[in-house]
Amino acid sequence: SRCRGYKKCVEQCPYKKPMFRGTTRISEKCIACYPRIEGLDPLTEGDQMETRCMAACVGKIRLQGLVKIGSNGEWAHDPDNPQYYLIRDRKVALPLYPQLGTEPNGYYVPSRHVPRAYSQQMFGPGVDHSIDQYMVPDRDLLGVLQLFRTTQRIIFKWKREPGPKIFETNIHGKKFEMYNDTVIGFNRKGKEIIRVTVEEPFYVRPEEHPGAI
């Protein structure tokens, strides 16, 4: 009838969502910072924000968002949404253990440095396709990847503005061309919330303030 703090749910959950709180001696589940997700946090001025754990990630490796759901309960076709584009359109981000059929809300871009057989066990047969795509990304895919960890606000739509060609090489026998495109992210209301370029800009510190940023 109540949690007794055996922590079995913590051991069994593949996503490690339940957390054991020592002060109350019960297991509690992550609530996904729902006031921030729903735009109810008074500090966010109505903008829907990522969870705190996403915002605290120091690496540019996480992207959180919301997708449209159709009348049939499935994801509505929306390639302008960065999550839909990466997961359903390009199939670069994959679900964990797809053979279990749980369809999680967490998707992962498999690493090319991990043994391929191990990645296939975790993410299924789409691993080769995913790695092949982001190893030699086209302009759209490279643009969307620039949006990772650029803002705490949830991006509902993205757009790429063409830029000049800045680099060209061959990767595993495939031609790769890089363009300094500008990628723009928009919130649910269509307002621009982030604008980044593919090439990271250089900032020159003035001589009179050598320690300034």
How would you label these PLM feature ranges?
Residues 1-27, 32, 39-72, 84-86, ...:
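Iron-sulfur cluster-binding cysteine motifs and their immediate structural context
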Residues 54-213:
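Long, compositionally biased charged/polar accessory segments in the mid-to-C-terminal portions
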